[in-house]
């Protein structure tokens, strides 16, 4: 499931294990360097390129997962 993959990436990059689907990336301490690492992980681990503007527009696991699903992306 895409949201599981997204959550795994966020937990690793934000160094937290308690991220829920509606937690806001920025409220969790996210910033541009971490966002760039997450963007790379999406490509490498989920096989989908997510533009930076979409990452800003979809700052929760649930919303970015829905965006990725709307692309028809499949996890590897």
Locations of regions flagged by a protein language model:
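Phosphopantetheine-dependent thiolation modules in NRPS/PKS and related acyl-activating systems
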Residues: 1-76
């Amino acid at each position: 499931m895409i949201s599981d993959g997204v959550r795994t990436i966020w937990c690793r990059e934000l160094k937290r294990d308690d991220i829920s689907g509606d937690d806001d990336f920025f409220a969790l301490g996210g910033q541009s360097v971490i966002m760039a690492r997450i963007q790379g992980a999406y490509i490498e681990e989920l096989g989908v390129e997510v533009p930076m503007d979409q990452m800003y527009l979809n700052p929760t696991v649930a919303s970015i997962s829905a965006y990725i699903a709307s692309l028809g992306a499949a996890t590897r």
